[in-house]
Swiss-Prot record:
InterPro entries: AreA_GATA (IPR013860), Transcription_factor_GATA (IPR039355), Znf_GATA (IPR000679), Znf_NHR/GATA (IPR013088). Major nitrogen regulatory protein. Positively acting regulatory gene of nitrogen metabolite repression. GO terms for molecular function: DNA-binding transcription factor activity, RNA polymerase II-specific; RNA polymerase II cis-regulatory region sequence-specific DNA binding; zinc ion binding. Keywords: Activator, DNA-binding, Metal-binding, Nitrate assimilation, Nucleus, Transcription, Transcription regulation, Zinc, Zinc-finger. Residues 146-159 have a biased composition (Basic and acidic residues). Residues 832-845 have a biased composition (Gly residues). This is Nitrogen regulatory protein areA. GO terms for biological process: negative regulation of transcription by RNA polymerase II; nitrate assimilation; positive regulation of transcription by RNA polymerase II.
Length: 971
């Protein structure tokens, strides 16, 4: 047994000694393998002894020797294995393990160790030399700063000790008090400032990179405690001014008024500068301290609802400061069960006139002085949107209930607004005043959304009296409650979107606010301070029919909606949609969502800033805008819907009447999608407007009116130049002569007994392409003279006879007309009659717009007027997209689609009436049975200029569906 042990212990040495390279470095080498080992002869001795047979004594000796060898191995492993052989940078790692961290920090700081690490292992790093350089600089700076701080502290301590000793010995010798030799206060102040400058910078790189560095600048930023005591002891007996540290400001200091003022300046109570004699030292202007005492507002608004001291205004000193900026609402407000107003509004006045105006009360917002609980936003959820009787609002029992006069948004300078009450609650989420787009989500009457308080119980009187909701005497309703809710993390503005947006793609009207009833100057206040405007939301849009209250699907036949009737093809495009009365905004910036106080149903089609100059007209919640007195012809949109009340049957067009209908209905449109119904757009004589003028070159003579992107009229030259080149046509290119191309007018076939060749005319009746939305009925081209109403004979080119085709679907046939009364598809052929002849205006002549001596000429190709043939079609040689319209007579705007080349049966409506009261040749519209009412309107009056100078109003009324066709103006 002993032999085996001896062999086992000695055989590894025998196998390892001859060849050193065979050693496995995973295991420690025997001591004899290392050069310079303590025992060199042990292997040879063991080798010689191994030849003889060992006995028990040899076995015990071998165990002893083995124990000695193991001790030597451990000592060598500590020195060699952890040394420079394998890990050179950890050479002193095991040897220094018994040393403390502080000692290691002094001898070998962490920055030095880091530099050593990066310096020795830089061949393994991506940025080798840069890392070594960085760590070297860190180490050098840290060590240098550390040494300088130690030296400075040592020098200061020595100097201080020496100075105290000298001063004490001198005072003892001379018998004088010690304070006489102390430095003055200014000297001490200078010295303290120098000491502060000499202190190290707190920006220690090691702190941010190596957080475990025990030598952080916190240890060196200020002198140590005992040295600070020495400083104080040295200056405690000084006769100088003591420099006291500034006191910590108290946390909350609030003005206990209901006036929203800034918090008062921090009162030092005279303790900071007691060494100064008490006199007024006005060294600076305190902007936070108001000079005047805040006015005693009649309704003192207590920030808290306390029953112990109901009017003690010191209670709201516990509230935090508030901000005028609207805070985000924390979570969804709680839904309460009652339907009463949560606050007794009338608490400080007996007979307040505002109490009975419940509609107005429900829309204002107020902000107490120091209450952060009331957000600076709409109170549509807090004040319930039902018509609250004044009895429930006039309870004077709770003296500390909230009351505030209505906030003032932009007051309407045109008329007193009349907000319309609504029976349903609305919630308008937290909004930025610059983008006022409320989330109009409706809810039932009994469930109003209330705000959340940060304190208080779930009910108004169940929790603490502080911050509980002041309610009515009968029912305490929690407007501010913090009942536990599983939906507290939900933002209602993100969840409850506009509920009509999914089912009904209605036209989103501009944002209506409380005072948004029709002033043209309402938009002037928008751009002043966009983020400071208090635009109060009202719970109901003033556009009753236009706000998309009813969902509709245009594809379903049974869906009733005014929007579906007006726009059968779906929602309109974001451009000037002139159909019915609705002409949405074309603003300069192209943004329809105007954040100011806009109108909803007025919808002025404004271009540029011309609208600023118009006179103000009074409006209320139900009347649409009246366009009287506007200076730009294109801003005269449809004053009323085209299906006006039947009282217009006497011949008075509702567009020219002084009374605009309050709830107009809208006609169905053609499927081509109406662009605009600019009724009387190019100039209304009764309204005192000038003829259509180009906004660029100011001409009134052009073969075709165009529009710029803002919707303002341009002549053909300016509009075409803008379209082709993208820039405004310079005025240097303006010429007074319109060059005409000599184009043939086709075969001349006598129409109505007229066989003479038609010529170009300059009359306002046959003006080609007058796209300023004139009515342009070609009734003046009738070729039958009349004794009572003589007109010159006008011959027209042939109009190819063509039966009504399937293209009649673009404008349905009026039910009151017979098949014999057909007319062309362009405005020059609106009216058909049983007269013996018809003046068909055809050809491709280019004529000026302005009035000129009448000449016989063919009108544009598509304008054929048939009054005696059963099916009269317009000429096929018409020019698409540029249909002629007679004169400066803007009455209705028709869409002439490229497909509508054939005649379309039925009279064309004019204004709100579709009838034809008097035909120019003295012919009465026998099929209409209308009262004839001649008028003497000239060409600039917006009516039809007859060739003989006598005009006749083409106004009437007819039963049955109207036929509508709108003319687009080509750009």
């Amino acid at each position: 047994m002993s032999t085996s042990v001896s062999i086992a212990t000695s055989s590894p040495v025998l196998t390892m000694n001859p060849i050193i390279t065979e050693h496995d470095f995973r295991f420690p080498r025997r001591p004899s393998a290392w050069p310079g080992a303590a025992i060199h002869n042990a292997p040879t001795q063991r080798t010689x002894n191994s030849n003889r047979i060992p006995n028990s004594r040899d076995a015990s000796a071998s165990f002893k020797e083995h124990k000695t060898d193991m001790a030597t191995t451990y000592s060598l492993a500590r020195q060699g294995l952890g040394g420079s052989a394998l890990f050179p940078f950890l050479q002193n790692g095991l040897a220094d393990s018994d040393r403390s961290i502080d000692r290691m920090q002094q001898d070998d700081p962490l920055a030095t160790q880091v530099w050593k690490f990066f310096a020795r292992t830089k061949h393994q790093l991506p940025s080798q030399h840069r890392m070594e350089n960085l760590t070297w600089r860190m180490m050098a700076l840290n060590i240098r700063r550390h040494k300088e701080e130690q030296q400075q502290r040592q020098d200061e301590a020595d100097a201080r000790r020496k100075k105290n000793m000298d001063a004490g010995s001198r005072a003892f010798r001379l018998g004088r008090p010690m304070m006489q030799s102390s430095p003055s206060g200014i000297a001490q102040l200078r010295k303290s400032s120098e000491n502060n400058l000499a202190q190290p910078d707190a920006m220690n790189l090691d702190d941010f990179i190596f957080s475990d560095n025990s030598g952080s600048p916190i240890n060196f930023a200020s002198p140590e405690g005992d040295k600070m005591v020495d400083d104080r002891s040295g200056s405690s007996m000084a006769s100088a001014i003591p420099i006291k540290s500034r006191k910590e400001p108290s946390l909350q200091n609030f003005v206990p008024q209901s006036v929203p003022v800034q918090p008062a300046h921090q009162a030092t109570q005279g303790s900071e500068f007691n060494y100064v004699n008490r006199h007024l030292r006005k060294t600076s202007i305190d902007d936070r301290r108001t000079r005047k005492r805040p006015a005693n507002f009649s309704p003192q608004v207590p920030a808290v609802n306390s029953t112990a001291a109901q009017n003690d205004l010191d209670l709201d000193s516990e509230l935090h400061d508030y901000s005028l900026d609207q805070p985000n609402q924390a979570g969804i407000p709680q839904q309460s069960n009652g339907s009463n107003v949560p606050f007794n509004i009338d608490t400080f006045m007996e007979n307040d006139s505002m109490v009975n105006n419940g509609n107005f009360q429900q829309n204002f917002s107020f902000s107490p002085s120091t209450s952060p609980m009331i957000p600076h936003g709409p109170f549509s959820g807090m004040y319930h949107n039902s018509s609250v009787p004044s009895a429930s609002m006039s309870n004077n029992n709770n003296n500390s209930d909230f009351y505030s006069p209505p906030a003032s948004a932009y007051p309407s300078n045109v008329s007193t607004p009349h907000p319309v009450p609504e029976q349903e609650g609305f919630y308008f989420g937290s909004q930025d005043a610059r983008t006022q787009r409320p989330q109009g989500f409706q809810q039932s009457i009994g469930s109003m959304l209330s705000q959340q308080f940060m304190y208080g119980g779930s009910n108004g009187n169940s929790g603490s009296t502080m911050f509980s909701a002041p309610g009515t005497a009968s029912e305490s309703m929690s407007a501010y409650s913090t009942a536990p809710s599983s939906f507290g993390h939900i933002d209602p503005s993100q969840v409850f979107q506009n509920e009509q947006a999914v089912t009904s793609p209605t036209i989103q009207m501009p944002q209506d606010n409380m005072f948004s009833f029709g002033a043209d100057s309402d938009d002037e206040d928008n751009n002043a301070f966009a983020d400071r405007n208090v635009s109060m939301q009202k719970d109901m849009s003033s556009s009753l029919d236009e706000s998309g209250a009813m969902g509709w699907d245009a594809s379903l036949p049974g869906q009733f909606s005014t929007q579906a009737a007006r726009f059968p093809g779906g929602p309109t495009r974001k451009q000037v949609m002139i159909g019915g009365t609705t002409t949405d905004f074309v603003d300069n910036n192209g943004d329809w969502e105007s954040n100011g106080l806009e109108r909803s149903q007025s919808q002025s089609f404004r271009g540029g800033n011309l609208r600023r100059q118009h006179p103000k007209l009074p409006r209320n919640a139900s009347t649409p805008v009246h366009f009287g007195g506007q200076q730009n012809g294109f801003e005269q949109l449809a004053q009323s819907m085209q299906s006006s009340p039947a009282g217009d049957g006497n011949g008075t067009m509702s567009g020219f009447s002084s009374v605009a209908p309050s709830r107009p209905s809208s006609p169905p449109m053609s499927k081509q999608g109406s662009t605009t119904n600019l009724q009387a757009a190019a100039g209304n004589g009764n309204d005192g407007n000038a003829p259509t003028t180009c906004t660029n070159c100011f001409t009134q003579t052009t073969p075709l009116w165009r529009r710029n992107p803002e919707g303002q009229p341009l002549c053909n030259a300016c509009g075409l130049f803008l379209k082709l080149h993208g820039v405004v046509r310079p005025l240097s290119l303006k010429t007074d002569v319109i060059k005409k191309r000599n184009r043939g007018s086709g075969t001349n076939v006598p129409v109505g007994g007229s066989s003479t060749r038609s010529k170009k005319t300059a009359s306002t009746l046959n003006s080609r392409k007058n796209s300023t939305l004139s009515m342009s009925t070609a009734t003046a081209n009738s070729t039958k003279p009349n004794s009572s109403n003589p007109t010159p004979r006008v011959t027209t080119p042939p109009a190819t006879s063509q039966p009504p085709s399937s293209k009649d679907v673009d404008s349905p046939v009026s039910g009151t007309t017979s098949g014999a009364n057909t007319a062309g598809s362009t405005p020059n052929s609106h009216f058909g009659g049983p007269g013996p002849s018809s003046g068909a205006v055809g050809g491709k002549g280019v004529v000026p717009i302005a009035a000129a001596p009448p000449k016989t000429s063919p009108g544009p190709g598509a304008s054929s007027m048939s009054m005696q043939r059963p099916a009269t079609a317009s000429s096929k040689r018409q020019r698409r997209h540029s249909k002629s319209i007679g004169g400066d007579v803007p009455v209705s705007m028709d869409i002439d689609s490229p497909d509508s080349t054939s005649s379309i049966d039925g009279p064309r409506p004019f204004g709100s009436s579709a009838g034809l009261s008097s035909l120019p040749g003295g012919m009465s519209a026998s099929s209409f049975n209308l009262n004839q009412r001649p008028s003497t309107l000239g060409s600039a009056t917006g009516m039809i200029s007859m060739s003989g100078g006598q005009t006749s109003s083409l106004i009437g009324s007819s039963a049955g569906p109207q036929e509508w066709e709108w003319l687009t103006m080509s750009l």
